[in-house]
């Protein structure tokens, strides 16, 4: 053993660690490595220290401050990353480690970063704006489904549509919903549905899956095809917790394919309830309409009665009777006052001690009586004359007298008497009052 030891090279710990480091750096050099970050720390120096691991192993890593400043994201535990590193050994402790030169997101982390970048770009262009959203048809007669023909999502949609609204026409646009061909096929089917115009609304979606599985619904081409679709589109991708770019661009986002089917279909009982409700509203509207027309007819009849010539004549007759009554009352009052004055004078004469004065006053009284009788006769005669003249004038002005001589009174629809042809237009209704009856006619021509 001592002989063997004399022939072997004996290393110190430092020499061994140095040799191992040189061997690692010389033989492996720079490597590319993917893994999940764990045990991440960042001391005040700014360097990053962490481990990269997979299901079976892990390795210590260091990324110095000047290098990690170039990384476009903040490293965190759980991130999947792709690193370029040098394999080395930390001699003081003999720890095998990687010195990281560059770092990029990998797997879902990279996809999530691309997702956020595209989301910001499309939002800045206004593709998510609410005023671009189209309303879903209130009663869809046909619905198009863009999805995998063999997927469970299609069966869920068809089952709900059949249960809720069997009369709804369904058109299936088969496409891949995962893989390299999915993006182009989805865009093609959206454009085909818009070209055919055989459906009222489109459902675009699939069942649940990983972010990578759902990635075709995060592609920019699919987002722009949804935005430019003239048919309203419901996105129904994955489960309620899955969010895709298609959800933001679509007119309506359904949390699941089943929920999308319920959005485009109306339950039969709901349709019957809606029909009954509208029937009630129609009946109420018709009742209000007829009541309004009846009230209008009653108002027109009342106005016609008020403007009838016989009504006007009755009013004039009442006014004449009132005037005659006032005249007779005035004359009676005048006579009573004169008689009272004469009685007073007679009493004064009877009480006078002077016969001559009595005789003289008697003569005056006789004269006054004669004058009074003469004046009263003139007054009554003049009053009778004036009364006869007024009655004759009133009778001559009576519309019925004019109508009795073969004349007529023509009025417009507002009840105004027509004096010339400029007060009416061709096509309007007019009413003609005769001595007996009214004729309603329509103006066909006018002459000056």
From Swiss-Prot:
Q: Give this protein's Gene Ontology molecular function annotations.
A: exodeoxyribonuclease VII activity; nucleic acid binding
In which compartments does the protein localize? Cytoplasm
The protein's UniProt keywords, in alphabetical order, are: Cytoplasm, Exonuclease, Hydrolase, Nuclease
Q: Which GO terms describe its cellular component?
A: cytoplasm; exodeoxyribonuclease VII complex
How would you classify this enzyme at the top EC level?
Answer: hydrolase
Chief location: cytoplasm
Which Enzyme Commission number(s) are listed? Answer: 3.1.11.6
Biological-process GO terms, alphabetical: DNA catabolic process
HAMAP family the UniProt entry points to: Exonuc_7_L (MF_00378)
Q: What is this protein called?
A: Exodeoxyribonuclease 7 large subunit
Q: Name the species this protein comes from.
A: Histophilus somni (strain 129Pt)
- Supply the gene name: xseA
């Amino acid at each position: 053993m001592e002989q063997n030891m004399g022939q072997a090279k004996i290393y110190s710990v430092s020499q061994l660690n140095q040799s191992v480091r040189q061997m690692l750096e010389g033989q492996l050099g720079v490597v590319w490595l993917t893994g999940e970050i764990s045990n991440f720390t960042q001391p005040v120096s700014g360097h990053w220290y962490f481990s990269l691991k997979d299901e079976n192993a892990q390795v210590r890593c260091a990324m110095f401050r000047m290098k990690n400043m170039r990384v476009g994201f903040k490293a965190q535990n759980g991130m999947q990353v792709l690193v370029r590193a040098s394999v080395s050994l930390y001699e003081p402790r003999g720890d095998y480690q990687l010195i990281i030169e560059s770092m990029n997101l990998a797997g879902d982390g990279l996809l999530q970063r691309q997702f956020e970048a595209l989301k910001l770009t499309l939002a800045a262009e206004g593709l998510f704006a609410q005023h671009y959203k189209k309303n879903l048809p209130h009663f869809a007669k046909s619905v198009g489904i863009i999805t995998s023909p063999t997927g469970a999502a299609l069966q869920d949609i068809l089952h709900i549509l059949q249960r809720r609204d069997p009369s709804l026409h369904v058109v299936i646009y088969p496409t891949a919903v995962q893989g390299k061909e999915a993006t182009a096929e989805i865009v093609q089917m959206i454009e085909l549905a818009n070209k055919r115009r055989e459906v009222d609304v489109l459902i675009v979606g699939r069942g649940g899956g990983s972010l990578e599985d759902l990635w075709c619904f995060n592609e920019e081409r699919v987002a722009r095809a949804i935005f430019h679709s003239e048919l309203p589109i419901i996105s129904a991708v994955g489960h309620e917790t899955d969010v895709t770019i298609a959800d933001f661009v679509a007119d309506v986002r359904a949390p699941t394919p089943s929920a999308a089917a319920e959005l485009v279909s109306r339950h039969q009982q709901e349709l019957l309830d809606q029909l009954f409700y509208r029937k009630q509203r129609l009946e109420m509207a018709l009742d209000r309409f007829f009541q309004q027309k009846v009230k209008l007819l009653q108002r027109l009849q009342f106005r016609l009665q008020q403007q009838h010539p016989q009504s006007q004549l009755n009013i004039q007759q009442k006014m004449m009777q009132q005037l005659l009554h006032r005249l007779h009352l005035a004359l009676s009052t005048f006579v009573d006052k004169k008689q009272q004055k004469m009685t007073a004078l007679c009493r004064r004469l009877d009480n006078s001690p002077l016969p001559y004065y009595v005789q003289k006053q008697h003569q005056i009284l006789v004269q006054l009586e004669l004058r009074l009788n003469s004046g009263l006769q003139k007054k009554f005669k003049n009053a009778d004359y004036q009364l006869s003249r007024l009655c004759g004038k009133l009778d001559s002005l009576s519309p019925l007298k004019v109508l009795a001589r073969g004349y007529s009174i023509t009025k417009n629809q507002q009840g105004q008497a027509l004096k010339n042809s400029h007060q009416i237009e061709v096509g309007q209704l007019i009413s003609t009052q005769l001595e007996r009856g009214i004729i309603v006619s329509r103006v066909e021509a006018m002459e000056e």
